[in-house]
Regions:
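Extended alpha-helical coiled-coil "stalk/arm" regions
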Residues: 33-91
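Helix-loop junctions and short alpha-helical segments
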Residues: 158-220, 234, 238-241, 245-272
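Solenoid-repeat scaffolds in large eukaryotic assemblies
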Residues: 229-231
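Charged, amphipathic alpha-helical stretches
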Residues: 1-56
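Charge-enriched, short contiguous segments at helix-coil
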Residues: 290-359
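Internal, Lys/Arg-enriched amphipathic helical interaction segments that engage polyanionic partners
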Residues: 72-200
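Short, mixed-charge amphipathic alpha-helical segments
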Residues: 202-207, 270-305
Length: 371
């Protein structure tokens, strides 16, 4: 992409962002995002304190006393624990004694109340942000724009992570190659910006830290012309996201074995999305992403490079001669997969936490009535 072409592309994108309705949507989403980040920080600070307190207590023998050494789903463990507590069953005495001897009951109780409030505020902030983004996608994305997104997706360029229609894909003279190359222009500044929020996370979990390291590594290899190495890393990132997405409710209602086959994972993801029927955007995107990724796993994707020859090092194959744009397309696919995964995991977490606190509240009220 020449400097003149990028300048034209950039100026057209700026014109779109300056439209009053789009500028307002971006401003609103930015404020809601900042609020959600602040609420998330508060939630995780309290969660970390609770984790440290709970893990400072000697709980040896508690599990055997309450559950008899049974391996139970998370929800079933909660139900059994509440039933024992309501009946003042002697089985729960071991836990009561451990808590009493720790001297931390009052502090933990106060923090649990703070955590419930912080969790509620966090979820509410995320729902507001999610709703604002959905409104933008519904009202600001014209049918012509949506059709162009689908046309691009059919050619392996997925831009469904856009929250406002500011990529100038409808502008005269802008081609699909221009859009891909816009991510690599100027030392990959646009691509790095796209993935910046991964790098900017405070105190990420060990798994998230490793994933971020691989994202940085993939972009770095891409920038230095090491396309096959970058592609292998992105294939690993895609595989990880597919697994995480499919396992969002594992071991909650039933004990689930972690599925290893792509087809089984895809079926689980579809089941989870079917349970979130009010959110149609992600279901539509999944209907596009799923067959594409399935074809990639089976080395049948016409719009993407051959995965098997890259992963298994078939150095006699000409399919190993890949380009910069091939890797960018994979990274864009990963961003779309990550968007779907985040959505599913967020709403599954909301479901789990809502059920937990609802059932605890019901148990407390029933015990009061029984006295």
């Amino acid at each position: 992409m020449t400097f003149e072409k990028y300048q034209y592309y950039y100026n057209e994108a700026v014109k779109i962002r300056q439209k009053p309705e789009i500028a307002l949507a971006i401003e609103n989403q930015t404020k809601l995002s900042e609020d959600a980040q602040a609420k998330a920080k508060k939630r995780y600070e309290i969660e970390d304190k609770l984790y440290e307190l709970y893990h400072s207590i000697d709980v040896k023998g508690v599990d055997d006393s309450i559950f008899g050494g049974q391996d139970l789903p998370e929800h079933e463990r909660l139900i059994q624990l509440m039933e024992l507590w309501m009946k003042d069953d002697p089985k729960i005495n071991v836990l009561k004694e451990k808590l009493a001897n720790s001297g931390l009951q009052e502090e933990i109780g106060n923090l649990e109340n703070e955590y419930q409030n912080a969790l509620y505020e966090y979820f509410l902030a995320l729902i507001k942000l999610d709703s604002a983004i959905n409104d933008s996608r519904e009202n600001l994305f014209t049918q012509e724009y949506k059709d162009k997104l689908k046309e691009y997706a059919d050619k392996g360029v997925l831009l469904y992570f856009l929250e406002t229609p500011d990529a100038p894909i409808l502008c005269e003279g802008i081609t699909i190659d221009d859009v891909i190359e816009s991510f690599s222009f100027g030392e990959f500044i646009s691509l790095k910006t796209l993935f910046y929020h991964f790098v900017a996370q405070e105190n990420p979990s060990p798994s998230m830290r490793r994933k971020t390291e691989d994202i940085v590594s993939a972009v770095d290899c891409l920038e230095h012309g090491q396309y096959r190495t970058a592609a292998r890393t992105v294939f690993a990132l895609l595989e990880s996201e597919h697994k995480n997405c499919s396992a969002a409710m594992d071991n909650y209602f039933t004990l689930d074995k972690r599925v290893r086959k792509g087809k089984q994972r895809a079926e689980r993801i579809q089941q989870l999305l079917d349970g979130l029927k009010e959110q149609t955007y992600f279901t539509k995107v999944w209907d596009i992403v799923n067959p594409l990724y399935r074809d990639i796993l089976n080395s049948k994707a016409e719009s993407f490079i051959d995965r098997n020859s890259i992963i298994h090092g078939d150095y006699y194959s000409e399919q190993l001669d890949i380009t910069e744009n091939d890797v960018i397309k994979l990274l864009l696919l990963f961003m779309n997969m990550r968007m779907i995964s985040d959505h599913i995991q967020l709403y599954c977490e909301m479901l789990r936490e809502s059920l937990k606190y609802t059932e605890i509240h019901i148990a407390q009220e029933l015990k009061k009535e029984a006295k």
